[in-house]
Swiss-Prot record:
The keyword Iron-sulfur does not apply. GO terms for biological process: heparan sulfate proteoglycan catabolic process; myelin assembly; negative regulation of fibroblast growth factor receptor signaling pathway; positive regulation of skeletal muscle cell differentiation; Schwann cell differentiation. It is found in: Cell membrane; Endosome. Belongs to the glypican family. This is Glypican-1. It is a lipid-anchor; GPI-anchor.
């Protein structure tokens, strides 16, 4: 009876070993012809590629079963997979930058065209209407438009002060032309001091100041917002992949080839976990990115109506014409008030004597009706901004679907990182803090990428400027694309996650993947979800233990 029982134990152990060996496709030596073909198509030499599977103890990233990959092949494919992901990221970034650039150039060109058309209308209409009141002061008007362009382009000018200085200079020159025999040079100071009370140009200066401040601030903040968004995308695209990510990408994309199943495509959730871990820092841009785009959509409300950007920027000449008309209409009253305030001036010995008859008249200009161009441009821009709002958090899924040849479904035929089979771990959340338990990529959540943290700050700064511009505030526009210094005591962790969470494993400083591949970590084999058979050497150990137990059984009795 004891011999029969002992034979039963031996039979069970042997059967288990045979069944598992047959059930694991990697345990049989198979042809590597398909892998050779794929490997050669990528430009690698086939001299070291085995004809059939070999033992895989030398592998450092892929599972160490039977394999079609040598150490050199694994290294080449690891570097190649990293370059493929970097290329895919750059393609996505360039596409987003192109979208933003298209919107920026369209709207920026339109606003500048409005200002150019206004100046052109002034140059065509003012000489005939105002004669030398305009022709002798063309530089003052030209300088005004030049400063308005500088302000629109983001120059650190104070628009209200710029306009006030223009009106003061213009008053001196025009009043001197109207009364050349009354105004010696020392009389002009008093005139300037009385200008605000005298209101020589009527309501035109005040109306232009109120409307232009809001209109130009809204227009330039929107255009600058597009520029900042594009610059953030460009700088984030330059952030290198971490070594842990490079290992995970190799395992995702090419370890199936080494395993001898190149036709197995990555399981969807497996791919998402790898990319969410690789792009954890990028996902942290999401909140401030959305805030910026929302603020840009909101500021477009300031483009419409009588005080809107299109009406005001394209109608600067209208307010200038009204100002000169008011000065001519109120010439006599204004002269009397100036004499009352400043006294009777001495006759200017260099004056032109009695006023000569000059060709002067009134100019009635109407604002040009909207062509609908800006409405179309803004409508397209708002639609594009809404489409790209979730760019950073949707990037892993987009890359998996479009670049990683992801399997359409998670089933027994997709690649789970170890073999063909279902992928069981849950998909991680978005952002750095949610990667603490990522089963595919080791992420140190206490070490955020500083370049990306700086870009998050740039997004915040630009959003605050847009919100100020919505209220009509003249914000100080520095170059928001400049890199921040990164100084300060904060480590950059969002909220208080650094205090609440601890990394699974403290990693060394991140450097680009070199040709020397790191060794397989002790946890690598534990990060599997498939219910696969253990390697054959495990069953040999089980088999020996079973023999010992069976042999010792009579003695226990």
């Amino acid at each position: 009876m004891e011999l029969r029982t002992r034979g039963w134990w031996l039979l069970c152990a042997a059967a288990a070993l045979v069944v598992c060996a047959r059930g694991d496709p990697a345990s049989k030596s198979r042809s590597c012809s398909e892998v050779r073909q794929i490997y050669g198509a990528k430009g690698f030499s086939l001299s070291d590629v085995p004809q059939a599977e070999i033992s895989g103890e030398h592998l450092r990233i892929c599972p160490q079963g039977y394999t079609c990959c040598t150490s050199e092949m694994e290294e080449n494919l690891a570097n190649h997979s990293r370059m493929e992901l970097e290329s895919a990221l750059h393609d996505s970034s360039r596409a987003l930058q192109a979208t933003l650039a298209t919107q920026l150039h369209g709207i920026d060109d339109h606003f500048q065209r409005l200002l150019n058309d206004s100046e052109r209308t002034l140059q065509e209409a003012f000489p005939g209407a105002f004669g030398d009141l305009y022709t002798q002061n063309t530089r003052a008007f030209r300088d005004l438009y030049a400063e308005l362009r500088l302000y629109y382009r983001g120059a650190n000018l104070h628009l209200e002060e710029t306009l006030a200085e223009f009106w003061a200079r213009l008053l001196e020159r025009l009043f001197k032309q109207l009364h050349p025999q009354l105004l010696p040079d020392d009389y002009l100071d008093c005139l300037g001091k009385q200008a605000e009370a005298l209101r020589p140009f009527g309501d035109a200066p005040r109306e232009l100041r109120l409307r232009a401040t809001r209109a130009f601030v809204a227009a330039r903040s929107f255009v600058q917002g597009l520029g900042v968004a594009s610059d953030v995308v460009r700088k984030v695209a330059q952030v290198p992949l971490a070594p842990e990510c490079s290992r995970a990408i190799m395992k995702l994309v090419y370890c199936a080839h080494c395993r001898g199943v190149p036709g197995a495509r990555p399981c969807p959730d497996y791919c998402r976990n790898v990319l969410k871990g690789c792009l954890a820092n990028q996902a942290d841009l999401d909140a401030e990115w959305r805030n910026l785009l929302d603020s840009m959509v909101l500021i477009t409300d300031k483009f419409w109506g009588p005080s809107g950007a299109e009406s005001v920027i394209g109608g600067v000449h209208v307010w200038l014409a009204e100002a000169i008309n008011a000065l001519q209409d109120n010439k006599d009253t204004l002269t009397a008030k100036v004499i009352q305030a400043c006294g009777n001036p001495k006759v200017n010995p260099h004056g032109s004597g009695p006023e000569e008859k000059r060709r002067r008249g009134k100019l009635a200009l109407q604002e040009k009706p909207s062509t609908g161009t800006l409405e179309k441009l803004v409508s397209e821009a708002k639609a594009q901004l809404r489409d790209i709002q979730d760019f950073w958090i949707s990037l892993p899924g987009t890359l998996c679907s479009e670049k990683m040849a992801m399997s359409p479904a998670s089933d027994d035929r997709c690649w789970n990182g170890i073999s063909k089979g279902r992928y069981l771990p849950e998909v991680m959340g978005d952002g750095l803090a949610n990667q603490i338990n990522n089963p595919e990529v080791e992420v140190d959540i206490t070490k955020p990428d500083m370049t990306i943290r700086q870009q998050i700050m740039q997004l915040k700064i630009m959003t605050n400027r847009l919100r100020g511009a919505y209220g009509g505030n003249d914000v100080d526009f520095q170059d928001a694309s400049d890199d921040g210094s990164g100084s300060g005591s904060g480590g950059g962790c969002p909220d208080d996650t650094c205090g609440r969470r601890v990394s699974k494993k403290s990693s060394s400083s991140r450097t680009p993947l070199t040709h020397a591949l790191p060794g397989l970590s002790e946890q690598e084999g534990q990060k599997t979800s498939a219910a696969t058979c253990p390697e054959p050497h495990s069953f040999f150990l089980l088999f020996l233990v079973t023999l010992v137990l069976a042999a010792a059984r009579p003695r226990w009795r």
